[in-house]
Amino acid sequence: MALQTLQSSWVTFRKILSHFPEELSLAFVYGSGVYRQAGPSSDQKNAMLDFVFTVDDPVAWHSKNLKKNWSHYSFLKVLGPKIITSIQNNYGAGVYYNSLIMCNGRLIKYGVISTNVLIEDLLNWNNLYIAGRLQKPVKIISVNEDVTLRSALDRNLKSAVTAAFLMLPESFSEEDLFIEIAGLSYSGDFRMVVGEDKTKVLNIVKPNIAHFRELYGSILQENPQVVYKSQQGWLEIDKSPEGQFTQLMTLPKTLQQQINHIMDPPGKNRDVEETLFQVAHDPDCGDVVRLGLSAIVRPSSIRQSTKGIFTAGKSFGNPCVTYLLTEWLPHSWLQCKALYLLGACEMLSFDGHKLGYCSKVQTGITAAEPGGRTMSDHWQCCWKLYCPSEFSETLPVCRVFPSYCFIYQSYRCIGLQKQQHLCSPSSSPSLRQLLPSVLVGYFCCYCHFSKW
């Protein structure tokens, strides 16, 4: 059964890849749609698939992709492939994401990054963004024979082990190590404060110990500074100042520079090696390394998420939005207790008004009417429809509060007014048609949040 599932997933990934230009030096898919994660939102079958495409020539690749998949891009597509590539390379973490795409029956997002930018990130941890993704188990779909890229991928894993060693005690378990490694790219990530599940790292590691072991096993076996008892799942490392100095000297260049910046007193201007020697003798060496990681991750995560406001989301046709339904108010609004609806691509109706087209609808809703009577059974009945061609159920509600959502760093508000064709499978509305609804949505959300 496991082999059959693996083969089925591989076929799915390859079919999705066939929808894009072929000139890829590396393509991989990651996240909860590929590897199971613990936690309440762990529906792997319906989870979004997250792809990253590495390309040698981003301008040429975006040019071809715009011809094949024009609807995947935000309004920035009208500026052309050169501007898109400039935004990709010069803002955020060097990656351009198109999100909320229905492809081959699955909801996906995909990021595009230059091969040179990726190699720099893997070797030096300039942003620790895609490099951080590649420190956790991913499914590589295709990779070319570029020796430099393959060497950088291996170097990134070894650097992750070294950084984790510096933040761990003298002896620890495999799980402790993998939790530290998985958390490297989340150190200082502002999304862990404002949006992400605080147990995200644990949810990634615990169900996937075997995958982490497969990724790092040979590196641990060959590392001269660790005693790896693989049968017991236990490790011991050299925590002497000499051992820590050796490890600090092999860290990626950007992390070394950040540590130097943190520890170098004003006016001293010590070189990096001198600072690292001091840190190696410091009892708080691990905390200093963690601060250095935060200094890399925090700004890159903020820049990338800010860029995502402009790059994420395709054209207004064929939308996928998560709706947060508000508490019941005197004028007949519906309560959903902060749980979510996710719809993508076949007709979805609210109060008789066509809102979108949804081929898959996923719920975990407990709705309530005044007086406390729940209507979850009826709600589930209305939404438990997965037929791709006939979806005509109308939800039994009067009005829905304007939607607001954070989906994979994309943010969008739409006021649910009497918009007869917010989208259709064959055409997208003009900006003039949609703009009043969008403005009403932003205004209502502003009023709602100002009240609180």
UniProtKB/Swiss-Prot annotation:
Pathways involved: Phospholipid metabolism; CDP-diacylglycerol biosynthesis; CDP-diacylglycerol from sn-glycerol 3-phosphate: step 3/3
GO CC annotation: mitochondrial inner membrane; mitochondrion
Alphabetical UniProt keywords: Lipid biosynthesis, Lipid metabolism, Magnesium, Membrane, Mitochondrion, Mitochondrion inner membrane, Nucleotidyltransferase, Phospholipid biosynthesis, Phospholipid metabolism, Primary mitochondrial disease, Transferase
Catalytic activity entry: a 1,2-diacyl-sn-glycero-3-phosphate + CTP + H(+) = a CDP-1,2-diacyl-sn-glycerol + diphosphate
Membrane disposition: Peripheral membrane protein
Top enzyme category: transferase
Annotated InterPro entries: Tam41
One Gene Ontology MF term: phosphatidate cytidylyltransferase activity
Involvement in disorder: Combined oxidative phosphorylation deficiency 56: An autosomal recessive mitochondrial disease characterized by lethargy at birth, hypotonia, developmental delay, myopathy, and ptosis.
Known role: Catalyzes the conversion of phosphatidic acid (PA) to CDP-diacylglycerol (CDP-DAG), an essential intermediate in the synthesis of phosphatidylglycerol, cardiolipin and phosphatidylinositol.
Protein name according to UniProt: Phosphatidate cytidylyltransferase, mitochondrial
Organism: Homo sapiens (Human)
